[in-house]
Amino acid sequence: MHHHTRREFLWQTWVGSTLVCSIVEGWRDLLRAQDPPAPRYDLLVKGGRVIDPSQGLSAERDIAISGHNIAHVASAIPESEARQVLNASGKIVTPGLIDIHVHVYDGVAPLGIPADPTCVAKGVTTVVDAGSAGAHTFPGFRKYVINVVDTRVYALLNISVVGQSTLSTDNPYGELLDLRYANPKLAIRTIENNRDVILGVKIRLTRNIAGDHDLAALKLAREAADAVQLPLMVHIGGSYSPLKDILALLKKGDVITHSFRGGEGGILDDNGRILPEVRSAVARGVRLDIGHGAGSFSFDTAEKALRQDLLPGTISSDVHQFNINGPVPVA
């Protein structure tokens, strides 16, 4: 009987092991070749009507997403190419919506509501807070809201240093009843220090907010907006001064919010016709914003304006503490 030497034993063991490994690897390669390829996309939103004004698109499309990016948009993308498929048939699919008039300084402005549950969770990914904060309260707004929420929040700075922190259901006195609170110097400084998030200046001119010195306050807001070369948003309706005098101080790029409100100080004359001063303002580039709010929109005004070919430039919600849970009164 032949006894294997240690060298022969090691040689045979090595050859056998190598052969087994080669066979196993061969099977692995074969199985790997038969496996379906890994999905190209993380998520496929399938069959929805995609409305994307930036692309001039309003049609049924599939949208493939990889990571945080839109990877592909086509009329038909196979479901096998995505790890997860969301059936959007019968639904509208849009880019994140933008609302240019909200109030999200929760806990400081009585109107304020939490940004994320109201905005990004409902498909509104970018908002402009319209004057909740003034020069004295803006640092807190930036630190505790803008810098921490998932919603992308920009701001219009209130010309009043206290912002919208005074007026509430239990305290019917607005932020400009004392004209000394309108401080262009502080507004300009605050805007210059926060140019990345402040997009303009905001003023409210209702009687219980600006009193009988509304035009004086508006001129101070105009001064601040001009100094920083940013637009001015003006809350109209129920003011001491007539709308024509307010419009005379507005320029191209400025915004009238609550533009289709009913009642005193609106865009219609007593016969339901568009005021000529409104026509002139729009012609020189002043923009009309809906700013629906809790009582700042009138179907009657809107219908009369539309019949006279006057359209809003933007449709904003003016969402706040007193309309978030609805229903919202309309005239």
Locations of regions flagged by a protein language model:
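Glycine-enriched alpha-helix->loop->beta-strand junction motifs that scaffold or abut catalytic
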Residues: 250-255, 282-287, 307-313
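Divalent metal-coordination and catalytic microenvironments
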Residues: 48, 68, 90, 101, ...
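His/Asp/Glu-enriched, well-ordered alpha-helical/loop segment
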Residues: 300-331
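N-terminal secretory signal peptides and thylakoid transit peptides that target proteins
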Residues: 1-18
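Histidine/acidic-residue-rich, glycine-tolerant segments that coordinate divalent metal ions
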Residues: 131-138, 145-275
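Metal-associated gating/positioning segment near the N- to mid-region
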Residues: 79, 83, 87-148
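Short catalytic-loop micro-motif centered on adjacent basic/acidic residues
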Residues: 126-130, 232-235, 288-292
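Histidine-rich, glycine-flanked metal-binding segment
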Residues: 30, 35-44, 49-94
